[in-house]
Amino acid sequence: MRRILVVAAAFSVLGFTGAASAQPRQGVDVNVSIGPNLQKNAHDYGSRELTDISNDLKEAVQSAVAHSRAAPPVRVDLVIEDAVPNRPTFDQLGRTVGLSFRSVGLGGARVSGMATYADGSQRPIREQFYETDLTQERGATTWYDADRAFDRVAYDLGRGKFPAEFSGPGPTGGGHFGYPFNNQ
């Protein structure tokens, strides 16, 4: 019995030591801005929505880079060039009578930017994800596919991978829920 207690104590000490050495990195400066094309949709989506998705991208990148095994950048500047919601935003629901939150569409996002390293070198970042199959949208939240694009950016940065060109299909949905849509 005594031997079991000694072994258990040793494992607990080793476990705590391993956890202490796996502390996340600090100090990565992540800046996210909204591109001019997406700013044009601010009146339709709502400015709160754009603030929320930029915060989502920032948090995803900070988390991935902090836990990265690759040499992390010291600064990441990102631009959300385009984002299309899967479901109506709060502003769209408030503006259109009869519009349901159950309405669903094809969403996604396009992100570009630059990662700067401690030695001054810079690497461009270009990533996009747009869903093309409506059957994949069951249970999707408002910005589900945009979040998938943000997760791809974060994953690539965490692994030190930088797609030089946009890949995959472009936007297939407009993100404009309700009829008629007034573009003014």
Could you tell me what each predicted segment is?
Residues 82, 140-184:
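Amphipathic, soluble alpha/beta structural segments
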Residues 11-12:
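Repetitive helical segments and hydrophobic/amphipathic motifs
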Residues 47, 62, 95-99:
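Short structured motifs
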Residues 71-73, 77-119, 133-137:
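Surface-exposed short loop/turn segments
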Residues 38-49, 121-160:
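Short secondary-structure boundary motifs at beta->alpha junctions and helix caps
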Residues 2, 8, 17-56, 86, ...:
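A structural "domain/chain start" motif
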Residues 49-82:
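N-terminal, post-signal-peptide region of Sec/Tat-exported proteins
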Residues 26, 70-72, 123:
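Short loop/turn segments at connectors of secondary-structure elements within structured domains
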